[in-house]
């Protein structure tokens, strides 16, 4: 991982701050749609700090600079940040939060500036209150200062064509989705909903794009009222097929006109659906993740209500067509991974081929690309050998990566976008003789993964409540991992999808798991400078039958759809109970049954799969 000298960039930024009377400037990770993964043109935090992880916030004062990120990226950030930066490790008790650190830089009258399009309205309010306690104030700086530093070198905003996502894969027409949304808005007496999250726009209209790497979304907004549906998108993105798909049911408007229209809507919030002058004015809804800019355009708290996005909740519950697509694409994807692992072992062990991490991941993409309905990868493949596996979101760089060591742990976290679903699988392997410590760590992680997979729980249970099931075996040894146990997964959409998840984030305590949720199950363990272990399956929530039904309420469990063998060499059977051994053997039997047919004429892969799926 390369370290970028940020001295000149920071010096220029501070000049711009001084010109605008800004004492501290914030640079969030997100774009104006609050996307986790962003287009290159929106990589402002990476540009100013040199840190390339997907999560974090940069804070720059006139004399100091700090970068806050979570446990997934502590190792990476410590390597990528130069001497200008202080690393704030989020979640570590001895360290201040980035909000607290920002407040510490203030004295009476000092100003904290931020681009209001890159922060949510609720975060802006919370930050403003924190800053006020230190005598400072928060200022929305309309012109992004990092963009000015970046100048002509900043990449252009993508303008890729949008495609129709057919009902045969979506399972529901966009007209039905809009009708359902309107019913929800009417229940809550809303004047309409302004859609700002890119995956929500794509899902609602059954459209897909290519503006953000690995995420089939496109830059857009939408406004849905009881009688209108407006899609804000650049004209050049639209093909004749897309226009025909939308027909006369959707009005197409320029992407940049959203704020002008939002302002007009805010000024006429006494909407047509009021039903009479005696009724209170109806407010427009925006997501709690919508930007401060959008909230201000609509008129702020008097005209706008921030709510849990009804689209996000609906999108997280997959319909039968989407669930069947997830099953099917994971079988094909599992076959691709199996072929890759068999090939990789043969190259490293039998042929003694010298391969680096990128060469290996290139081969995996080549194999995947031949699968039915393949569109592209769902994220940048993590192909990591030895100590690199301890970097949770490691990114092997083509000109600066490691040779794969057959005598070390190899961790591969990868996924693909298929027309019928999105995949995300992690497997940790060893092509030589693993140490006792590596086998123990792997087995403890595996026990945690099985505990989630086999969990049965009453309806209303959250992923927050389930998280300890995955960690319990590591905890008994005084071990842990600094990332979530699971995240929601889209259906040919973002591989990280809210609002569900398994972990300690507050949002995971607010959303009960429901039938139709698709989520990852991925505990891990990492030793910096030595090795990393992670095992990940995708699971789907379903209703299960129990002997009793306390409280006369439904009980839920999971169905796993990932079909890729575990690494038998890393499993220590002495640490497993009979139920866990039974689960592993039944899982491997299922993997063999569902994927071996792909290798009828591929003796190498078939033999590898047969060996890896033998009973333990």
UniProtKB/Swiss-Prot annotation:
<keyword id="KW-0645">Protease</keyword>
<dbReference type="Pfam" id="PF16189">
    <property type="entry name" value="Creatinase_N_2"/>
</dbReference>
<feature type="binding site">
    <location>
        <position position="536"/>
    </location>
    <ligand>
        <name>Mn(2+) 1</name>
    </ligand>
</feature>
<comment type="similarity">
    <text>Belongs to the peptidase M24B family.</text>
</comment>
<dbReference type="InterPro" id="IPR000994">
    <property type="entry name" value="Pept_M24"/>
</dbReference>
<feature type="binding site">
    <location>
        <position position="424"/>
    </location>
    <ligand>
        <name>Mn(2+) 2</name>
    </ligand>
</feature>
<feature type="binding site">
    <location>
        <position position="413"/>
    </location>
    <ligand>
        <name>Mn(2+) 2</name>
    </ligand>
</feature>
<dbReference type="GO" id="GO:0005737">
    <property type="term" value="C:cytoplasm"/>
</dbReference>
<keyword id="KW-0378">Hydrolase</keyword>
<feature type="binding site">
    <location>
        <position position="424"/>
    </location>
    <ligand>
        <name>Mn(2+) 1</name>
    </ligand>
</feature>
<comment type="function">
    <text>Catalyzes the removal of a penultimate prolyl residue from the N-termini of peptides.</text>
</comment>
<dbReference type="GO" id="GO:0046872">
    <property type="term" value="F:metal ion binding"/>
</dbReference>
<dbReference type="Pfam" id="PF01321">
    <property type="entry name" value="Creatinase_N"/>
</dbReference>
<dbReference type="InterPro" id="IPR033740">
    <property type="entry name" value="Pept_M24B"/>
</dbReference>
<dbReference type="InterPro" id="IPR036005">
    <property type="entry name" value="Creatinase/aminopeptidase-like"/>
</dbReference>
<dbReference type="Pfam" id="PF00557">
    <property type="entry name" value="Peptidase_M24"/>
</dbReference>
<keyword id="KW-0482">Metalloprotease</keyword>
<dbReference type="InterPro" id="IPR050422">
    <property type="entry name" value="X-Pro_aminopeptidase_P"/>
</dbReference>
<dbReference type="GO" id="GO:0070006">
    <property type="term" value="F:metalloaminopeptidase activity"/>
</dbReference>
<dbReference type="Pfam" id="PF16188">
    <property type="entry name" value="Peptidase_M24_C"/>
</dbReference>
<keyword id="KW-0031">Aminopeptidase</keyword>
<dbReference type="InterPro" id="IPR000587">
    <property type="entry name" value="Creatinase_N"/>
</dbReference>
<protein>
    <recommendedName>
        <fullName>Probable Xaa-Pro aminopeptidase P</fullName>
        <ecNumber>3.4.11.9</ecNumber>
    </recommendedName>
</protein>
<dbReference type="GO" id="GO:0006508">
    <property type="term" value="P:proteolysis"/>
</dbReference>
<keyword id="KW-0479">Metal-binding</keyword>
<feature type="binding site">
    <location>
        <position position="536"/>
    </location>
    <ligand>
        <name>Mn(2+) 2</name>
    </ligand>
</feature>
<dbReference type="InterPro" id="IPR001131">
    <property type="entry name" value="Peptidase_M24B_aminopep-P_CS"/>
</dbReference>
<dbReference type="InterPro" id="IPR032416">
    <property type="entry name" value="Peptidase_M24_C"/>
</dbReference>
<dbReference type="InterPro" id="IPR029149">
    <property type="entry name" value="Creatin/AminoP/Spt16_N"/>
</dbReference>
<keyword id="KW-0464">Manganese</keyword>
<feature type="binding site">
    <location>
        <position position="522"/>
    </location>
    <ligand>
        <name>Mn(2+) 1</name>
    </ligand>
</feature>
């Amino acid at each position: 991982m390369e370290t970028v000298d940020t001295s000149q960039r920071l010096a220029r930024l501070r000049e711009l701050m001084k010109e605008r009377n800004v004492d501290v400037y914030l640079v969030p990770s997100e774009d104006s749609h609050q996307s986790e993964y962003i287009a290159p043109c929106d990589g402002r935090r990476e540009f100013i700090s040199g840190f390339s992880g997907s999560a974090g916030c940069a804070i720059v004062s006139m004399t100091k600079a700090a970068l806050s990120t979570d446990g997934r990226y502590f190792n990476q950030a410590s390597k990528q940040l130069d001497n200008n930066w202080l690393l704030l490790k989020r979640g570590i008790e001895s360290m201040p939060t980035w909000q607290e650190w920002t407040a510490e830089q203030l004295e009476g009258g000092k100003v904290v500036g931020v681009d209001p399009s890159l922060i949510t309205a609720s975060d802006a309010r919370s930050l403003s209150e924190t800053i006020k306690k230190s005598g400072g104030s928060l200022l929305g700086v309309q012109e992004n200062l990092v963009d000015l530093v970046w100048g002509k070198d900043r990449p252009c905003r993508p303008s890729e064509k949008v495609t129709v996502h057919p009902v045969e894969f979506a399972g529901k027409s966009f007209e039905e989705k809009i009708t359902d949304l309107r019913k929800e808005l009417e229940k809550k007496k809303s004047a309409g909903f302004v859609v700002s999250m890119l995956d929500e726009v794509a899902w609602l209209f059954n459209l897909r794009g290519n503006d953000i790497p690995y995420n089939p979304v496109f830059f857009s907004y939408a406004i849905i009222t009881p009688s209108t549906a407006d899609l804000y998108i650049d004209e050049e993105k639209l093909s004749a097929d897309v226009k025909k798909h939308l027909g006369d049911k959707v009005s197409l408007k320029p992407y940049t006109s959203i704020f002008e229209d939002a302002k007009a809507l805010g000024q006429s919030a006494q909407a047509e659906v009021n039903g009479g002058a005696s009724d209170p004015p109806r407010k427009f809804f925006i997501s709690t993740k919508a930007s401060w800019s959008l909230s201000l355009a609509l008129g702020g708290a008097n005209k706008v209500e921030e709510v849990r996005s009804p689209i996000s909740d609906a999108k997280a519950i997959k319909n039968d067509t989407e669930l069947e697509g997830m099953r099917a694409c994971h079988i094909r994807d599992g076959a691709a991974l199996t072929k890759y692992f068999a090939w990789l072992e043969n190259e490293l062990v039998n042929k003694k081929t010298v391969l680096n991490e990128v060469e290996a991941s290139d081969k995996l993409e080549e194999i995947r690309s031949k699968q039915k309905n393949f569109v592209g990868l769902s994220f940048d493949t993590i192909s990591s050998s030895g100590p690199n596996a301890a970097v949770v979101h490691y990114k092997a760089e083509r000109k600066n990566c490691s040779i794969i060591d057959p005598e070390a742990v190899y961790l591969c976290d990868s996924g693909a976008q298929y027309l019928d679903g999105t995949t995300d699988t992690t497997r940790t392997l060893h092509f030589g003789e693993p140490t006792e410590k590596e086998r123990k760590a792997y087995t403890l992680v595996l026990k945690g993964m099985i505990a989630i997979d086999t969990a049965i729980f009453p309806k209303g249970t959250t992923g927050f409540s389930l998280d300890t099931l995955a960690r319990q075996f590591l905890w008994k040894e005084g071990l842990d991992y600094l990332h979530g146990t699971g995240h929601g997964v889209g259906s040919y959409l973002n591989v990280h999808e809210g609002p569900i998840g398994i972990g300690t984030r507050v949002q995971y305590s607010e959303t009960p798991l429901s039938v139709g949720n698709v989520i990852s199950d991925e505990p891990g363990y990492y030793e910096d400078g030595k090795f990393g272990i992670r095992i990940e399956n995708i699971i789907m929530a379903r209703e299960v039958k129990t002997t009793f039904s306390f409280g006369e309420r439904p009980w839920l469990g999971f169905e796993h759809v990932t079909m890729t063998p575990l690494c038998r060499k890393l499993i220590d059977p002495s640490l497993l109970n009979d139920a866990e051994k039974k689960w592993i053997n039944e899982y491997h039997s299922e993997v063999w049954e569902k994927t071996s047919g792909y290798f009828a004429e591929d003796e190498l892969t078939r033999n590898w799969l047969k060996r890896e799926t033998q009973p333990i």
